[in-house]
């Protein structure tokens, strides 16, 4: 998603800062220590936090009319970021937890709270965090949009148009060929764990990359350890689900508040 946005001539996201998720966690602790005990008001603290974030986002790559940032799990801090940037808009990317967990394990991605040697605990963690992020996104109407990975790669033109409309951006054909703009419009941070994937064109191969990678015992437990999968519309009844329903024209008509 980040590379697709970066391909737009009016947008610059740049590579993952790999700093802001930790900073957002730290500032929560600082608020308790300083705002409550030293006379520093929330407004003053917010100004300081937003100034730091703005400097990082604005200056870690070239300027553009519209700036964006993509760092894993920053959506967990959506209420705070909305307060700091009341005119900002947010995209919550949603993907099948089985693909997410497989990707973390396969690429050895270090994400706080995820123990890659314990698959079940990873699904539990995903369930908790996605539920929280989805709830927070749903409570930011007009500011936050949910985008399903499985729909984006099957209906890229339609979904990208939906996204640009939400962001009040003109549609750009360049967004459909972000891979051709790597190193030009699209900058990569070689330390990003997703760098190798970003270099690929939009394709459906990743949909089934997790097939045959989990034991039947693990898959049978999903409804208990990650029930939010079903709420989001993912089929947990079979080991190799068909994602074609995510490409249906009426896909969004059957989405409830939680999904």
Swiss-Prot record:
3'-phosphoadenylyl sulfate binds at residues 95, 103, 107, 149, 194-203. Disulfide bonds join 13-68, 137-144. The gene is tpst-2. InterPro entries: P-loop_NTPase, TPST-like. This is Putative protein-tyrosine sulfotransferase. Keywords: Disulfide bond, Glycoprotein, Transferase. The keyword Glycoprotein applies. The active site is at 16 (proton donor/acceptor). It comes from the Eukaryota.
